[in-house]
Design a protein with these regions (language model features):
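The C-terminal output helix
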Residues: 117-128
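Two-component/phosphorelay signaling modules centered on CheY-like receiver
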Residues: 6, 15-38
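C-terminal output helix
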Residues: 90, 107-118
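Short amphipathic alpha-helix used as the core "switch/output" element in two-component signaling
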Residues: 65-77
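A short, hydrophobic beta-strand element within the central beta-sheet of small alpha/beta folds
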Residues: 77-89
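Conserved acidic carboxylate
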Residues: 12
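Acidic, metal-coordinating helix/loop segments flanking the phosphotransfer/catalytic sites
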Residues: 22, 36-54, 62
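As written
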Residues: 94-103
Length: 128
């Protein structure tokens, strides 16, 4: 946790989804967006400069070579919010290890808030 809230990064390739999620994150006083990556090659650079508590992750990032980044490079303590049109149960690709929450597109602000509230409650219970 940062002094004024929980740090997060956004990994997403769709412009409208990026804009919407950046707006949702900015509406919450307890979240601090440290950066956004739209290509696999940008993820590692972003993680070199920050260690986010929460990672908003689109599972399908078409830009960049699969060798540019793999999920084992994420901080082990990070909490993942998977943002996708495909439910995780139907996804056949790689999924990161760790605590995972899911938001299906299109994402309403109400669903976003419920997800974040649940994550923050879990963090507070764990830290008690």
């Amino acid at each position: 946790m940062m002094e004024n809230g929980f740090s997060c990064i956004l990994i997403e390739d769709e412009a409208l989804a990026i804009e919407m999620l950046q707006d949702y994150i900015s509406r919450r006083n307890d979240l601090i967006l440290l950066g956004t990556a739209i290509e696999r090659s940008e993820i590692q650079s972003l993680l070199r400069i920050c260690s986010p508590t929460i990672i908003f992750l689109d599972l399908v990032i078409p830009y960049g070579d699969k060798n540019d980044f793999n999920y084992s490079k994420f901080p082990e303590s990070s909490i993942f919010v998977i943002i996708s049109a495909t439910p995780i149960s139907h996804y056949n690709g790689e999924i990161p290890n760790g605590e995972i929450h899911e938001l299906l597109k299109p994402i309403s602000f109400e669903d976003f808030n419920k997800c974040i509230d649940k994550i923050l409650r879990n963090i507070k219970v764990t830290n008690v």
